[in-house]
């Protein structure tokens, strides 16, 4: 080999190595750009992010629901609701024709006038009702002793707030998510009652403490339920991240606070360790540690699949998979309308075959990453392959809603039960103390349960203040 040939060979080898390094760098940068674009494109419609994280630039509405073919608004046969005209008025004001004013026969005509039309105005009268309790002393004519009456147990001081005012304050602060300072302003201006923020906090905390026994009963009801929903959401408490966990069904709501999101937080709630029914959740890995029957929230899967479709429009499998899930849901609803409790075996077999076929297509469109020579460790597989793995590994739990009609399609029940927690933190930003967060979750557990039993929140609060919180539901 001549010196020139040797030089050209060395240069060629150097170029090959340089191109290989550049190719690896470009591939790594492309992966990083793809990850950043996916993160940038995430919103509440194509991921598990809450709507509050969308900011002012809301994505265009693109519902996953299909058109029902029905016109918008109330449907034929729908029972409407309006302000009733049947209420008995406490005051009647009659209006004579304007031209009769000043007529000498005005009073005579007024006595003969007939009612042409009645219109009613419903308004509220705001007044403070003060009840004075006094003890009486008498001298017994039989014994000669001086006897004195006693105050009711709930009348403890020279002056105090009544139960309706306490109930209103608790309802404002929890159900209404009104801050203590705003409550102080409202009660001062509307009722003329002086309140301090400390008094508001004290009332709410005292009310929560009285619910300890009820919380134990609600927890037992959720544990004994054949199907329960589980979820969690992050909240700031005393400048630290905590987690509000929920375990609920269509009749009871159990909320509790924990410093942990995963298995430790679930153990702290003492629901899942004793639960033996079907647990519906969002596929968070910690739930799979419990030896129960699991149902996966398909609404979460649809949002994730929507995200894949938007970020990787060239891939076909997410569209097919979304269509399959929605078809299963539609078939279930049609079967339930005819009184069935599961889909026919041949339909389930066809669904299973197509499910497996779409999983195979997903792996074909997303091959395993190739290990780079000289680079330590396994190559990073990415979130897309992780989603496909989940759909493959938990197929039985994803399809459970079609095999057992007791199992719902989604985990909306748990998400609805957590919604007021997010509303409260959106208004207040955070909870200053752990006891305050604990108290709020107890109260919302009780009120959420009362709502499911058909009892309005204010009535439920008054029942609890009267010492009868369990009156909200039948034993």
Label each PLM-derived region with a short phrase.
Residues 6, 13, 27-28, 136-139, ...:
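Catalytic center-proximal scaffold of phosphoryl-transfer enzymes
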Residues 1-160, 201, 230:
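Short, flexible loop/hinge motifs at secondary-structure junctions
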């Amino acid at each position: 080999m001549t010196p020139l040939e040797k030089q050209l060979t060395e240069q060629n080898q150097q170029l090959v190595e340089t191109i290989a390094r550049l190719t690896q760098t470009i591939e790594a940068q492309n992966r990083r750009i793809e990850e950043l674009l996916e993160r940038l494109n995430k919103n509440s419609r194509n991921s598990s992010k809450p709507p509050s994280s969308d900011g002012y630039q809301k994505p265009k509405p693109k519902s996953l629901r299909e058109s029902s073919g029905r016109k918008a608004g109330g449907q034929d046969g729908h029972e409407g609701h309006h302000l009733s005209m049947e209420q008995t008025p406490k005051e009647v004001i009659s209006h004579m024709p304007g031209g009769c004013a000043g007529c000498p026969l005005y009073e005579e005509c007024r006595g003969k006038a007939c009612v042409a039309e009645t219109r009613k105005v419903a308004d509220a009268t705001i007044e403070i009702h003060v009840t004075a309790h006094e003890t009486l002393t008498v001298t017994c004519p039989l014994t000669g002793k001086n006897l004195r009456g006693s105050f009711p147990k709930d009348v403890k001081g020279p002056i105090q707030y009544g139960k309706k005012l306490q109930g209103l304050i608790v309802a404002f602060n929890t159900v209404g998510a009104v801050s203590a300072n705003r409550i102080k302003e409202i009660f001062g201006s509307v009722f003329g009652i002086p309140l301090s923020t400390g008094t508001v906090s004290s009332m709410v905390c005292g009310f929560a403490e009285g619910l300890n026994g009820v919380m134990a009963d609600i927890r037992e009801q959720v544990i004994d339920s054949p199907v329960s929903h589980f979820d969690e959401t992050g909240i700031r408490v005393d400048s630290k991240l905590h987690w509000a966990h929920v375990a609920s069904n269509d009749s009871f709501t159990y909320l509790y606070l924990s410093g942990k999101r995963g298995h430790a937080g679930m153990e702290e709630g003492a629901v899942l360790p004793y639960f033996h029914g079907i647990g519906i959740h969002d596929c968070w890995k910690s739930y799979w540690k419990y030896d129960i029957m699991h149902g996966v929230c398909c609404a979460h899967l649809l949002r994730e699949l929507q995200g894949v479709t938007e970020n990787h429009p060239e891939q076909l499998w997410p569209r097919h998979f979304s269509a399959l899930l929605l078809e299963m849901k539609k078939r279930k609803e049609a079967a339930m309308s005819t009184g069935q409790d599961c889909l026919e075996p041949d339909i389930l077999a066809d669904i299973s075959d197509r499910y497996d076929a779409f999983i195979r297509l997903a792996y074909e469109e997303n091959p395993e990453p190739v290990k780079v020579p000289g680079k330590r460790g396994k190559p990073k597989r990415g979130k897309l392959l992780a989603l496909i793995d989940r759909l493959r590994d938990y197929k039985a739990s994803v399809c459970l809603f079609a095999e057992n009609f007791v199992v719902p399609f989604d985990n909306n029940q748990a998400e609805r039960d957590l919604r007021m927690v997010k509303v409260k933190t959106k208004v207040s930003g955070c909870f200053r103390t752990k006891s305050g967060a604990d108290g709020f979750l107890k109260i919302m557990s009780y009120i959420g349960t009362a709502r499911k039993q058909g009892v309005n929140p204010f009535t439920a609060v008054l029942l609890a203040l009267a010492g009868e919180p369990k009156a909200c539901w039948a034993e």
